[in-house]
């Protein structure tokens, strides 16, 4: 029987934690980033690293910004090399995982569910 939930190894969890902390630090500093990110407060909601440790999926949520999600994604992708270099300096591995950014729909989904429950 297949497990319903995915389990993550200790290495995956540790690497995800390091990447999360590094992302928070580089976003706070703002150095080497796309200028559109300077006035765009972001929250990194979670980081999920694949089993082979080659891809880090980073989920974010913007707050009080005039930028669209597409503009934020474009700015993050333009800054991806600088972010990856910063993370490479933080980890002690042969390679640095590829960073992929995703908008976190979790809060939007929670609001939709709350509205549906309210309408019952």
Curated annotation (Swiss-Prot):
Keywords: Cytoplasm, Ribosome biogenesis
GO biological process, one term: maturation of SSU-rRNA
Coiled-coil intervals, chain numbering: none
SUPFAM superfamilies registered for this protein in UniProt: Ribosome-binding factor A, RbfA (SSF89919)
Major localisation: cytoplasm
Top-rank taxon, per record: Bacteria
GO terms for cellular component: cytosol
Family annotation (Pfam families): RBFA
GO-annotated molecular function: ribosomal small subunit binding
Compartments reported by the entry: Cytoplasm
Keyword hit for RNA-binding: no
Sequence intervals crossing the membrane: none
Family of the protein in this entry: Belongs to the RbfA family.
Function of the molecule: One of several proteins that assist in the late maturation steps of the functional core of the 30S ribosomal subunit. Associates with free 30S ribosomal subunits (but not with 30S subunits that are part of 70S ribosomes or polysomes). Required for efficient processing of 16S rRNA. May interact with the 5'-terminal helix region of 16S rRNA.
HAMAP family: RbfA (MF_00003)
Quaternary context: Monomer. Binds 30S ribosomal subunits, but not 50S ribosomal subunits or 70S ribosomes.
Protein name in the entry: Ribosome-binding factor A
